């Protein structure tokens, strides 16, 4: 597992909930790959999780990964909160169900395949990787908005 991949992720939503998009920039050596997607009715937090999940699903072998996100919800959720959620059968300490548990469970399943360091970066702060991921997420969101316009 000596492949090091750097991933930048972001999510975007028009309204919360509303049409949303996710984007990810994957970098390996001198190669980069941009990916994005959308959902017609979603939340910003679901798009943040989806960006990380879909980026990890692209990787075909075990890697050392650094994931950069401007979402404290994603970074804290996957590095700190998730362990208690699992212990509490996907409930928070107040016994309320964890929001987005379906996505958290899928993301957690991807973790065992890799060695991952999660890093938070300030959004919209001149970080080129974060800016690229944001543009991809916005592209996904705008695609969702256009589809909804076509449907009337």
From Swiss-Prot:
Keywords: Cytoplasm, Endonuclease, Hydrolase, Magnesium, Metal-binding, Nuclease. Residues 1-142 form the RNase H type-1 domain. Its EC number is 3.1.26.4. Its cofactor is Mg(2+). GO terms for molecular function: magnesium ion binding; nucleic acid binding; RNA-DNA hybrid ribonuclease activity. Monomer. The keyword Mitochondrion does not apply. It holds the Pfam family RNase_H. It comes from Rickettsia conorii (strain ATCC VR-613 / Malish 7). GO terms for biological process: DNA replication, removal of RNA primer. The gene is rnhA. The lineage of its organism: Bacteria, Pseudomonadati, Pseudomonadota, Alphaproteobacteria, Rickettsiales. It comes from the Bacteria. Endonuclease that specifically degrades the RNA of RNA-DNA hybrids. The keyword Protein biosynthesis does not apply. Its main location: cytoplasm. Belongs to the RNase H family. This is Ribonuclease HI. GO terms for cellular component: cytoplasm. It is found in: Cytoplasm. Mg(2+) 2 binds at residues 10, 134. SUPFAM superfamilies: Ribonuclease H-like. NCBIfam families: PRK00203.1. HAMAP family: RNase_H.
